Amino acid sequence: RQSSSKLTQPKLMKLTPTRELAIQVAEAFQRYASHIKGFHVLPIYGGQEYSGQIRQLKRGVQVVVGTPGRVMDHMRKGTLKLNGLQALVLDEADEMVSALKEGLDIIIKEIPKTRRTLLFTATMPGTIKQLIQNYMSKHVVHIEADMETVGHQGIDHQYVVVEPIEKLEVLLHFLNSKEGQRGIIFCKTKAAV
C-alpha cells in the first residue's frame, strides 16, 4: 500500500528477537520501498541512542522494526504511539516467546485489537499456541512448510547441540573434517561469532 508523507504514526511494526535481525529487516524494508516518497522505516533496538530514534519518530515513520525491550521503553516514555497500528509481525516468535514473553504480552495488550497479526516461527511450542489463542483472531490461517518444500534436496542439513564453552572447539573440528567443502554456519547473535 502506498503511503503519504502525512502519515506520522507507524502502520506496521515488526518485532524481532535481536538487534542484528532488526537492522537487517529494516534495511530490506527500505530497499523494497525506496521508490515510495515519504516512506520511512525505523529500526529501534537497545545499544543505540534514544535521541536519534525519538527524532525520527517525531518526524514520522510508517514502519517500525524493533526488539521488544526497546519498543517497550519507547511505549513507556510515550515516544512511540501505536494507536494507528494496522499490522504486527512477530518474526522468530518462538525465540521471542522463550526469552521475552512478558514484553510481548505488554506490547500486544497496548496495540489496537483490529490489527492484522502475522507470526513466523520455526517451531510450534505450547507457548506459541497460547500466544495465538490469547492474541490472534479466531480465524487463524496456519501455513506449514516442511523440508521437502523449503530445503534443497541436495543440501545436507546438520546441527550439533553442545555446551557454550565447547562451541569453538566443536566448530573448528567440524570445519577441519569438511575441508574442501562449502557450507553456511548460522549463529544466533553477532556477539556469538
Language-model features: locations:
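Conserved helicase RecA-like core
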Residues: 1-193
